[in-house]
């Protein structure tokens, strides 16, 4: 093995060792420190808000019953189906009890031994079971058979009208609530996916934070707009501690951040400049930061014209410094564009400055050198004083 081959071999071993050490350091920070100090999220990766309201008085809780429609829509499916079944069974039983009372007051029950030529309020109600079945037939409108109302009692006629109207209201409300629950744009938001990790690398000569987002449906989101909020704990000059201090984070794509053409996966990025809250962070100190980056995507569903919002969040362990996303869009032989979602969240390591301040300081130094303000080739030397020429 010659000297040149040995030097190449040493360089290769050194590069592999540095990369292995970097991966081990990243794994150690993520799995050891990440587990020992689990960060609290305001927004989960799926977009659910992790917030709990405590010490809410009874008067404030009553507001939820005033806005009963929104309360029913926000119920989980198991509670909604419980309310659905309880509403129908409860109304059938309640009106069955009222029909039994009508028959009892009018002495139509067999225990009163009514004469054969006497016309009852409701024919063939012999007890609570038959009264419940008559209530079910009335409210569901399946048609009368053996039991029916006569014109003998005005109370029975009024109760029949009242139950029919109330049954229509219950049917409309409960069926409408289930239909609205199914058609909520929240379900459309499930087909919008974000990358598990955010990356920081150079893009267009600038240091950027990049996130990949994809629409799993072929139908578009009209008027899509994407933005972010950086949540962290800050202390004001007056000494006040703000737990969830919000800072606006502007995200753009190459075509701008308004009216995105969201037909294929997009890589959105935030430029880390002097106005960015990430400007003073570095690769070595990123995992030690305490922040949460919440990303929002607003748009209008093309098929229903309903507005939906998709949310996700990133904590420092989920931001990879010095990586970029793998390309996933290719062109087939048939002339179609193919998206490989197998590599949607995959990243590759790239050469990246370890801090934004270093990148911009280097650019400023180069600019000063071009203008002659900082020229290392210019050397100032002392000149000996000479006497004036004597005449």
From Swiss-Prot:
Source species? Rattus norvegicus (Rat)
The segments labelled Polyphosphoinositide (PIP2)-binding in the record are 180-207
Output the PTM entry: Phosphorylation at Ser-44 by SGK1 is necessary for its expression at the cell membrane.
Q: Which residues are glycosylated according to the annotation? A: 117
Activity regulation (UniProt) = Inhibited by WNK3. Activated by phosphatidylinositol 4,5 biphosphate (PtdIns(4,5)P2).
Query: Per its record, how is this protein called by name?
Result: ATP-sensitive inward rectifier potassium channel 1
- What is its membrane topology? Multi-pass membrane protein
Describe the function of this protein.
Answer: Inward rectifier potassium channels are characterized by a greater tendency to allow potassium to flow into the cell rather than out of it. Their voltage dependence is regulated by the concentration of extracellular potassium; as external potassium is raised, the voltage range of the channel opening shifts to more positive voltages. The inward rectification is mainly due to the blockage of outward current by internal magnesium. This channel is activated by internal ATP and can be blocked by external barium. In the kidney, probably plays a major role in potassium homeostasis.
- Cytoplasmic topology: which positions? 1-77, 178-391
The record, for InterPro entries, names: Ig_E-set, IRK_C, K_chnl_inward-rec_Kir, K_chnl_inward-rec_Kir1.1, K_chnl_inward-rec_Kir_cyto, Kir_TM
Residue span of the signal peptide, if any?
Answer: none
Mutating residue 188 to Q: effect? Reduced polyphosphoinositide (PIP2)-binding
Motif Selectivity filter mapped to chain: 141-146
* Cited Pfam families: IRK, IRK_C
* Transmembrane stretches, start-end: 78-102, 156-177
The residues on the Extracellular side of the membrane are 103-127, 147-155
Quaternary structure? Answer: Interacts with SGK1 and SLC9A3R2/NHERF2.
Instruction: List site positions: Role in the control of polyamine-mediated channel gating and in the blocking by intracellular magnesium.
Output: 171
UniProt key word Transcription: no
User: Where Phosphoserine occurs, residue numbers?
Assistant: 44
Q: Which residue windows are intramembrane?
A: 128-139, 140-146
Coiled-coil annotated residue ranges, if any: none
By sequence similarity, the record places it as follows: Belongs to the inward rectifier-type potassium channel (TC 1.A.2.1) family. KCNJ1 subfamily.
Superkingdom is Eukaryota
């Amino acid at each position: 093995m010659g000297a040149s081959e040995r030097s190449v071999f040493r360089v290769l071993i050194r590069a592999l060792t540095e990369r292995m050490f970097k991966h081990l350091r990243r794994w150690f920070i993520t799995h050891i420190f990440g587990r020992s100090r689990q960060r609290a999220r305001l927004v989960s990766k799926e977009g659910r808000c992790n917030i709990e309201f405590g010490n809410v008085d009874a008067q404030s809780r009553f507001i939820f019953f005033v806005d009963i429609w929104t309360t029913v829509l926000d119920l989980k499916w198991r509670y909604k189906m419980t309310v659905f079944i309880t509403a129908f069974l409860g109304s059938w039983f309640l009106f069955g009890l009222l029909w039994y009372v009508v028959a009892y007051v009018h002495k139509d029950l067999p225990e009163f031994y009514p004469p054969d030529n006497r016309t009852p309020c409701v024919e063939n109600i012999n007890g609570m079971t038959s009264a419940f079945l008559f209530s079910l037939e009335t409210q569901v409108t399946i048609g009368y058979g053996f039991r029916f109302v006569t014109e003998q009692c005005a109370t029975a006629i009024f109760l029949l009208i009242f139950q029919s109207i109330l049954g229509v209201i219950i049917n409309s409300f409960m069926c409408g609530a289930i239909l609205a629950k199914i058609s909520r744009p929240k379900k459309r938001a499930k087909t919008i996916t974000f990358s598990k990790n955010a990356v920081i690398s150079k893009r267009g000569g600038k240091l950027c934070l990049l996130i990949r987002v994809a629409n799993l449906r072929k139908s578009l989101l009209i008027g899509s707009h994407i933005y972010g909020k950086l949540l962290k704990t800050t202390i004001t000059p007056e000494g006040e501690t703000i737990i969830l201090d919000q800072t606006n984070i502007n995200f753009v794509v190459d075509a701008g951040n308004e009216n995105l053409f969201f037909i294929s996966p997009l890589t959105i990025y935030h430029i880390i400049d002097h106005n960015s809250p990430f400007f003073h962070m570095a690769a070595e100190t990123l995992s030690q930061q305490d922040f949460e980056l919440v990303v929002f995507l607003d748009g209008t569903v093309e098929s229903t014209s309903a507005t939906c919002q998709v949310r996700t969040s990133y904590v420092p362990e989920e931001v990879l410094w010095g990586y970029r996303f793998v390309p996933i869009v290719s062109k087939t032989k048939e002339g179609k564009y193919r998206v490989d979602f197998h590599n949607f969240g995959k990243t590759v390591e790239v050469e990246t400055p370890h801090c934004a301040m270093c990148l911009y300081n280097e650019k400023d130094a180069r600019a000063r050198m071009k203008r002659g303000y900082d020229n290392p080739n210019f050397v100032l030397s002392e000149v000996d004083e000479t006497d004036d020429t004597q005449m």
